[in-house]
């Protein structure tokens, strides 16, 4: 049981890293705008490939994490889309998600949305939303429950 859960934890961590890299691609997009003006699309294509590969890798890692976690079928919850503050780590990302959404809305209304800080907030909203869904969801909850069972 412990070996399978450690595989599940590893895949879950890999998915989080992949989603972080995917979100970080938004930070590079405005920086490569100058290459579009000069007629070179190579960097845009590379960033697009990185975005899609990390998104796909993150989803596959989540699937493999779910497959390798014991006791997940006993938990009746699904993804953490509409659940908030299910544990301490999730609460941190939920607060960051709310702050990021508010900041993005304010910046979009106050500016024309082309400032670099808008991209930073969009990247933050993307990553914190994904983390919200993962950390409030069934897999992470199952890992916490199994950890508490093994410690007791």
Label each residue range with its predicted role:
Residues 95-124:
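Alpha-helical transmembrane segments and their membrane-interface junctions
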Residues 62-76, 126-152:
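Cytosolic juxtamembrane helix at the C-terminal end of the final transmembrane segment
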Residues 1-9, 78-83, 142-149:
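Cytosolic juxtamembrane N-terminal segments of multi-pass membrane proteins
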Residues 36-40, 82, 115:
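Juxtamembrane/interface segments of multi-pass membrane proteins
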Residues 1-65:
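N-terminal first transmembrane alpha-helix
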Residues 23, 27-30, 78-81, 105-108, ...:
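Hydrophobic membrane-targeting alpha-helices
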Residues 64-95:
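Loop-to-transmembrane helix junctions at the membrane interface
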Residues 12-19, 89-97:
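Select subsegments of transmembrane alpha-helices in polytopic membrane proteins
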């Amino acid at each position: 049981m412990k070996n399978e859960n450690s595989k599940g934890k590893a895949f879950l961590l890999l998915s989080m890293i992949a989603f972080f890299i995917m979100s970080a691609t938004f930070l590079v997009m405005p920086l490569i705008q100058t290459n579009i003006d000069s007629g070179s699309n190579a960097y845009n294509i590379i960033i697009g490939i990185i975005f899609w590969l990390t998104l796909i890798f993150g989803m596959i890692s989540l699937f493999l994490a779910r497959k390798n976690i014991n006791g997940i079928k006993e938990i009746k919850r699904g993804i953490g889309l509409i659940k908030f503050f299910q544990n301490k780590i999730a609460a941190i990302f939920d607060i960051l998600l709310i702050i990021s959404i508010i900041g993005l809305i304010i910046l979009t209304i106050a500016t024309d949305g082309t400032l670099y800080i808008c991209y930073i907030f969009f990247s933050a909203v993307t990553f914190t939303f994904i983390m919200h869904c993962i950390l409030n969801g069934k897999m992470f909850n199952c890992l916490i429950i199994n950890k508490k069972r093994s410690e007791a």
